[in-house]
Amino acid sequence: MTGEGRAPYEVLKVAAASKPVSVAGAIAGVIRSQQRVEVHAIGAGAVNQAIKAIAISRGYVAPVGLDLICVPSFIDLTLDGQERTGIRLLVEVR
């Protein structure tokens, strides 16, 4: 996904086994440098970890005056040769 005249977003893939604190650090790092990031998750467990990570990352970037918004959408991904529907969470600075 690209914005108007913007380069493609950096994509972070989250699994059910991902640690939210680690993902939050990655999200905060990309947000600080690029102002936006896409988080992809397939399955309820992965979506849960991704949402927790986004909430944690808000706490990491808020002290420097950055407020995050999250825009969810569906995405079709190919995983091991199979089409899967996942969730795309676009995280941007408001």
Give residue ranges: language-model regions.
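Generic structural hydrophobic/aromatic packing signal, biased to beta-strands
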Residues: 12-14, 27, 50, 54, ...
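Short, hydrophobic/π-rich interface segment
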Residues: 44-68
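An N-terminal amphipathic alpha-helical segment
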Residues: 4-35
